[in-house]
A protein has these predicted regions:
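Active-site beta-strand termini and strand-to-loop segments that position acidic
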Residues: 50-53, 163-166
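Conserved acyl-donor/pantetheine-binding loop and adjacent beta-alpha core of acyl/acetyltransferases
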Residues: 63-97
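Short amphipathic alpha-helix that is part of the acyltransferase structural core
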Residues: 1-43, 47-49, 56
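Conserved GNAT acetyl-CoA-binding A-motif
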Residues: 97, 123-136
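Conserved beta-strand in the GNAT
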Residues: 49, 55-65, 98
Length: 167
C-alpha cells in the first residue's frame, strides 16, 4: 500500500516530454541566474525543458563545444568557436554537449531531464560526450554522481562531471 502511494506520486514522470524552449525565467536558475536568455540562445546554445501537460517541470541549458571548459568564460569562447566552425561543417556544431545549469520545479524532474537529454544526445550523429560545468557544491556532486556521472576534472571555481555515452 505504501509502495503504491510512492509510485503514484511519481507517475507523472511517465508522461513528460523533452522540448526546446526559447526562454526561461532566469531568476529561477539556482546555478547561473546571471546568464540571460540572450546568452542561453546565442552561438548554438540551447535551453531544454521537461514538459508535463502545460507545465515546465525541469530545465537544462547547453552549449556545444569541441573541448571541456573550466569556466563560464571558457564555455562562452568555446561555444562561439564551435559555432563558427559549424559554418564549414553543414551546421554540425561541436562534439561535446556541455550542460551548464539544471533545475527542477518538481521532485524527480532533475533526474528525469538528465535521462531524457542523455537519450537525445545518444541518438545524435555528432555528439560524443555529455559533460557538465557544475558549481563546486556538495549538492551538484551528489546530483550528478547519483545520476551516473563521474568526476572528470576539478577546476578553480567549477567541476566537470561526465556521463558515460558508451553502449
Amino acid at each position: 500500500m505504501v509502495l503504491n502511494k510512492i509510485l503514484d506520486k511519481f507517475d507523472w514522470l511517465k508522461k513528460v516530454k523533452l522540448i526546446e524552449l526559447n526562454e526561461v525565467d532566469t531568476s529561477e536558475d539556482p546555478v547561473r541566474p546571471e546568464l540571460d536568455n540572450w546568452f542561453r540562445q546565442q552561438y548554438g546554445r540551447k535551453i531544454y525543458g521537461l514538459k508535463d501537460g502545460d507545465e515546465i517541470v525541469a530545465v537544462m541549458c547547453f552549449a556545444f563545444t569541441n573541448d571541456v571548459p573550466a569556466s563560464v568564460e571558457e564555455l562562452d569562447t568555446m561555444s562561439k568557436v564551435a559555432h563558427m566552425e559549424a559554418i564549414h561543417r553543414a551546421g554540425v556544431q561541436g562534439k561535446i554537449a556541455i550542460a551548464y545549469t539544471v533545475w527542477s520545479r518538481k521532485r524527480g524532474g532533475g533526474q528525469k531531464i538528465v535521462e531524457e537529454v542523455y537519450k537525445m544526445i545518444k541518438k545524435s550523429n555528432h555528439l560524443t560526450r555529455l559533460v557538465t560545468l557544475s558549481p563546486m557544491t556538495d549538492m551538484a556532486r551528489r546530483f550528478h554522481t547519483k545520476n551516473g556521472a563521474k568526476e572528470l576534472r576539478v577546476n578553480k571555481t567549477t567541476v566537470n562531471f561526465e556521463y558515460d555515452m558508451g553502449d
